[in-house]
Amino acid sequence: MNNQSFKNSLSLKVILKQRKRNRLLLIFLCFFIVVIAISLIMYAMRNMVSFFRTPSEITKEDILIGRPLRLGGFVEKGTVEYIGKMKVTFFVTDNAKHKKVVFIGILPDLFREGQGVVVEGYFDKQGLFVGKRVLAKHDETYMSKETADHLNKHHTVEK
């Protein structure tokens, strides 16, 4: 009988080890599936993410890729040009560099030269920023503190 209890004890230990191994395998598998799912979601959304950049922060890759992004800074004085009723061109500057923007649509009421602006759009093949949406700003709500400090160091916002 002693031999029988030893066998039962041994088989119980084997069963417990198998369960523990299976549990660890299940936890690892769940973790792996979650990591893969998050990676796929991030990969699928990479073109939908709209980054905020000042003209100085724009890279050649931003221009070549033509991905959606946000261009922020101030509307450069003397650059707003209306072409027809709905088309307007202007330069967005951070006082170090500037980028030309082409926008077709109705501008917000707060839009004016010297005022802060964020333009959502993309760069076309000629390097012009094609705006799809213009957000005129009356403060630094749309930008990080570092970006606002950089812009305000060289520019006084008109109120």
Curated annotation (Swiss-Prot):
It is a single-pass type II membrane protein. The keyword Membrane applies. GO terms for molecular function: heme binding; metal ion binding. The chain crosses the membrane at residues 24-44. Its main location: membrane. It is found in: Cell inner membrane. InterPro entries: CcmE (IPR004329), CcmE-like_sf (IPR036127), NA-bd_OB-fold (IPR012340). Pfam families: CcmE. Residues 45-159 are periplasmic. Residues 1-23 are cytoplasmic. Heme binds at H138, Y142. The keyword Metal-binding applies. It comes from the Bacteria. One of its GO terms (biological process) is cytochrome complex assembly. Coiled coil: none annotated. Keywords: Cell inner membrane, Cell membrane, Cytochrome c-type biogenesis, Heme, Iron, Membrane, Metal-binding, Signal-anchor, Transmembrane, Transmembrane helix. Heme chaperone required for the biogenesis of c-type cytochromes. Transiently binds heme delivered by CcmC and transfers the heme to apo-cytochromes in a process facilitated by CcmF and CcmH. HAMAP family: CcmE. PANTHER family: CYTOCHROME C-TYPE BIOGENESIS PROTEIN CCME HOMOLOG, MITOCHONDRIAL. Belongs to the CcmE/CycJ family. This is Cytochrome c-type biogenesis protein CcmE. It comes from Bartonella quintana (strain Toulouse) (Rochalimaea quintana).
